[in-house]
Amino acid sequence: MLLKDKTVVIFGGSGAIGRAAALAMAKESARIFLAARQADKLEKAAAEIRAAGGSVETLQLDVLDGGQTTAQVANLAGRTGGIDIVVNATGFLHNQGKTLAQLSLAEYHQGFVPFLDAQFTIAQAVAPWIGGEREGVIITTIPPSATMAVPGHLGHIVGCAAMEAFIKALARELGAKNIRVLGVRSHAIADAVLAGSYTAEVFATKAQALGLSVEQWLGGAAHSTMLQRLPTLAQIAGVITFLASPSAAAMTATVVNVTAGATLS
C-alpha cells in the first residue's frame, strides 16, 4: 500500500503509459484521476482500472488549453482537499526521420512546442494545490533523445533536452514548497504500440523510410541497447510508482534513466 489514500492526477491518462501507471498506482491504493482529451478513450481506461478494483474518476480536458486545465484542476482540488501526485504522460504526434533539408519550420516546432507547453500548463495548474504539509510530486515521462545525436530528430532532440531542463529548474523553484519534481526517461516501449500508443504512427514513418515494419524497427532498437531489450509498460509504471512513494522522498531534480542502457546519464 505504498500510495494509500493518495490523490493522483495522470495527464495523458488514456494513453498507454498513463493507463499502465494508473493501474500500478491503483494497486497501491491510490485514488486515481485520469485526464485526457477524448471521452471515449478516458472511459475505456477508467473501466480497465475499475475492473482491477481501483478507484478512478475522469477529467476531459486539453492540456494545451491553460485556462481549461487550471479550472478543472482547481475544481478537482476543491473536491479532494488537494493533490498529492501528478503524472504527466502526455504525448503529441511529431516527425522523426526528416533531416534539416526536408523539415519544415512547423514540423520542427511540433517536436517541442506542444510538449513544453503541456509541461508548463500542467505545472502551473497543479502547483497551488500540492506541497506544504502534504508532500507533492510531479513526474513527467520523457523520450530518450535528450542525450542522443541522431539524424532526422532535430525538433524531437531539442524537445527532450528542454523537458529535462524544465524538470530541474522547476524542482529548484518548488522544492521549498515540499514539492518534488522528477522525470522518467524511457526508450521505445516494447508493448506500447500494441497497447494503442500514438508512437505507433511516429515509429511507422521511421520504419518505412528504412524499408522496415514497425516490429522490425523495434527489434533493431532493442538490439542497440546494452541489455538487448526494450523497457515494458509495466516496468515504466513501476518506476513511476516508486518515485511517487515515500521511498523516494529524498529524490528531486532527477531524470531516471529507464532506457535499458540506450543512453547514459
Locations of regions flagged by a protein language model:
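Catalytic loop of short-chain dehydrogenase/reductase
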Residues: F92, L105, G111, V137-M163, ...
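Short C-terminal tail/terminal secondary-structure segment
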Residues: G97, R229, I240-F242, T252-S265
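A glycine/serine/threonine-rich, flexible loop-to-helix segment
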Residues: A176, I189-S224
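Conserved glycine-rich cofactor-binding loop
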Residues: T7, S14-G15
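The beta1-alpha1 cofactor-binding region of Rossmann-like NAD(H)/NADP(H)-dependent oxidoreductases
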Residues: D40, Q60-A71, L105
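Alpha-helical segment proximal to the catalytic Tyr-Lys
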Residues: P128, R172-E173, A249
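Substrate-binding pocket helix/loop in short-chain dehydrogenase/reductase
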Residues: G97-L100, S104-F112, F203, A221
